[in-house]
Amino acid sequence: MQIGITGGAGFIGSALALRLHASGHTVSVIDAFTDYYDVELKLERARLLQQNGIEVFEGNVHEDLPTWLGSHSFAAVFHLAALPGVPGSLQEPHRYIEDDIAMTVTVLEAARTYAIPHLFFASSSSVYGEQTGALLEHQATGQVMSPYAAAKYSAETFCQAYQNLYGLQIGIFRFFTVYGPAGRPDMALYRFIEQALRGQPLTVFGDPIRDFTYIDDITRGMEQALQAQATGVFNLGANRPESVRDAAAMLGERFDVPVAFAPARAGDVSMTWSNTDAARKTFGYVPSVTLADGMERMITWHRDRL
C-alpha cells in the first residue's frame, strides 16, 4: 500500500515510516521541520528515512498538502504533524489552535477532496485530564488541564464530526508517554539520560506517575490498526503506571548523580494509565517492552551519540 505520514520527521512519525517500509509498504512523509526542538535531530531522522528509500517531502501541511497528496494515491494517511507538549501550550496557546486544531481540519478537508480511504489521527492521553486508574476511552469528557490537551480533544471532535458528516474512515490513537531512542528532547526520560551521562543533576517536577510506552509497541499497534482498517478511538499505552521519581532515582544511583525535586508544573496531570482492551480486541495490540528494557535501549543510543 501507499502510505502517507504527516510529521514524518518527528519521533513517532519517523519510527512508523521505517516500520511500514520494512513491512513492504511504499511510504512518503511530509514535515515542516519546525524548531519546537532541535531541528538537527529531525534532519537526522529524515536522512535515515531517505537512506532507507522513504520519500521525504519538506513542506507545511497548511500550504503544501494538496501538492503532496495530489502526487500520490495513498491508501491511508497517518496525521501526526502537530505542536507537542504541555509547557509550550501555556506560553503560546494560539499556535496550538493553528497547528493542532486548524491543521487537523486542513487534513480532514483534504481527505474529503482527495478521497483518502483511511485516516489515522494521533491524539494524546492528555485528553483525559486529571483522573486516576486505568482509563477507558469513554472517560475523556473534556475536563482537560492545558491548552495542548484542549487542542487535541478539539481535534478529536473534528475527526468525529467529519466521520459522521462525510463517512470518512478515521482511527484515533491516544498515545501514553511514548519514549525510546531518537525521542523528543523535552521528554523526561530523554532529559534524565542525557543529564545522567554528562554527570549533571536530575530534576523531577512533582510526583508524577506515567504509563511509559516504548516506541516499538506504539508503531506496532499503529501498523496493526492499519491492517485491521480500524476506526474509532483507541488507547495505545503500556498498561504499567510507573513513578517518574523511581526512574530518576534509578538513573541517579547508576550514574552517581543527585536527584532534586521541584513543584509540579502547571498543566501536568499527576497520573496517566491506559486500559488498552479496545485496541487489543480490535486489532491485537499487546505492549511487550518493559520500562527497564526500554531505558537500556535509550542509554545505549545516547551513549553512542556522546
Could you say what each language-model-derived stretch is?
Residues 1-174, 178:
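N-terminal Rossmann-like NAD(P)+-binding domain of SDR-like oxidoreductases, especially those catalyzing
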Residues 11, 128, 176-179, 212-214, ...:
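Conserved hydrophobic/aromatic "anchor" residues
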Residues 89, 139-141, 170-181, 191-213, ...:
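A conserved pocket-lining segment of Rossmann-fold NAD(P)-dependent short-chain dehydrogenase/reductase
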Residues 97, 145-156, 183-190, 211-212, ...:
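Short-chain dehydrogenase/reductase
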Residues 101-109, 186, 216-219, 223:
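Conserved active-site region of classical short-chain dehydrogenase/reductase
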Residues 134, 185-193, 251:
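A glycine/serine/threonine-rich, flexible loop-to-helix segment
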Residues 154, 158, 162, 192, ...:
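Hydrophobic alpha-helix immediately C-terminal to the catalytic Tyr-X-X-X-Lys motif of short-chain
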Residues 196-306:
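C-terminal substrate-binding subdomain of Rossmann-fold SDR/epimerase-dehydratase oxidoreductases
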